[in-house]
């Protein structure tokens, strides 16, 4: 049992970190082991946007004991996670949100368990995907990244006169939702997920 949250402020110049911290404090009963937050801004040129992440072990108030940590999380869109470890390790490396940079910036927070995580991990490693943790959440993120990359490549090839790699192809709702559907078919179990997608949102 973990807690996850996503927020998007209509004001592109706003900062959602306060809402995320408040929300995760309310959800603290769902996980007291660790907390993590990732934010971005939709007001900037998306090519210049970077994800900002703060993670730590302990309660939300302990992660943000130093007020400067909250100042690192600029942006009007974000996701957050409080952990109650049921799968994977319990160290700092296992604190969510997890991040992948291909085919675009992706940050994921997940609650639940994948019953086929070992099989997924073996499939991912056989395709030269590097996994840093034993968390089923990281496997889920990489499965989603694979499907999104495949969809972007198929879209790029189908676009007349559209040259370049998958990174030059914008993520459309169709490519995104199809990747979600394919991911959910492959990842067996009971779970909820929020994903921050670069150049798209939550």
Task: Label every PLM stretch briefly.
Residues 1-202:
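Conserved short alpha-helical segments that host acidic/polar catalytic motifs at enzyme active sites
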């Amino acid at each position: 049992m973990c807690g996850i949250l996503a927020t998007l402020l209509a004001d592109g110049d706003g900062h959602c970190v306060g809402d995320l911290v408040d929300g995760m404090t309310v959800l603290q009963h769902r996980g007291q082991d660790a907390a993590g937050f990732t934010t971005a801004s939709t007001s900037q040129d998306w090519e210049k946007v970077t994800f900002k992440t703060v993670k730590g072990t302990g309660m939300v108030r302990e992660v943000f004991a130093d007020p400067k940590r909250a100042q690192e999380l600029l942006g009007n869109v974000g996701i957050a996670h409080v952990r109650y470890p049921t799968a994977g390790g319990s160290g700092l490396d296992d604190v969510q949100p997890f991040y992948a940079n291909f085919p675009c910036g992706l940050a994921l927070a997940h609650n639940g368990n994948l019953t086929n995580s070992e099989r997924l991990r073996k499939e991912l490693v056989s395709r030269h995907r590097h996994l840093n943790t034993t968390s089923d959440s990281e496997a889920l993120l990489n499965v989603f990244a694979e499907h999104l990359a495949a969809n972007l490549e198929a879209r790029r090839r189908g676009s007349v006169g559209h040259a370049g790699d998958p990174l030059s192809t914008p993520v459309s709702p169709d490519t995104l939702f199809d990747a979600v559907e394919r991911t959910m078919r492959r990842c067996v179990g009971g779970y909820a997920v929020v994903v921050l997608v670069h150049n798209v949102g939550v």
